[in-house]
Amino acid sequence: EMSASLVGSEMCIRDRFLDKGFALAKTTEIAKQAGVTHAMLHYYYRTKEKLFERVFQEKVDLMAHSLVATLDDGKPFLKQMEDLTGAHFDFIAENPKLPFFLLNEIHLNEKRRELYLPVLSSAVRNTLQNVERRLEQAVKRGEVRPIRTADLMFSIFSLNVMSFVGQSLVQQAFDLDREDMRQFILQRRAENIEMIFSRLRK
């Protein structure tokens, strides 16, 4: 059974991978930051690849669950999309380093792309399927305008991701302090939802 000290240190382990990426994250540094011995880390995870796999799978599962959990047939479709867009935005706000992590580890690294893209694709596909059925029904009921599910979800993902990827540029270009930036991000959440609504409303 995994020791309590290691379980309690897993957030440190995740942060190290998100900060450094796979190639630059050293298991000795991970163990030191997590407050465990290198031998203990190796005993529970065997290899850096296994540790990375655990971190990646956990983040993908968490994101997928947070999105699917917003879908409820008892709510109007627009409300479901408001909740889904907001949940995705909040997930990135809680994991702001994740977009860069995915870019580095999947888009720029062919080996890890082959290993982990299917995991990410499976989670995205599951969300798409859940949204697609509800979207088709909403269009038939005349609630929303027709749109391909892939286009809708890509718009949601790209709007939300760019709100965080572009933070440094926005902060410098508009000379925003920390509080201004916090307010800007809060406003982006509402703006992103409104932009999705503007495409769906009849």
Describe each PLM feature range.
Residues 83, 90-130, 151, 178-183:
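Short secondary-structure transition hinges
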Residues 55-83, 121:
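Amphipathic alpha-helical linker/stalk segments
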Residues 3, 16-50, 54-55:
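Helix-turn-helix
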Residues 87-90, 94, 125-141, 145, ...:
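C-terminal peripheral helix-coil segments that are non-catalytic and often amphipathic
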Residues 1-8:
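Single conserved hydrophobic/aromatic residue that forms the stacking wall/gate
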Residues 11-12:
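Active-site loops and adjacent core secondary-structure elements that bind or stabilize anionic groups
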Residues 19-23, 74, 95, 141:
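Short coil/turn segments at alpha/beta junctions that flank glycine-rich nucleotide-binding fingerprints
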Residues 47-52, 62, 115, 119:
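Short amphipathic alpha-helical segment with a characteristic S/N-K-E followed by hydrophobic residues
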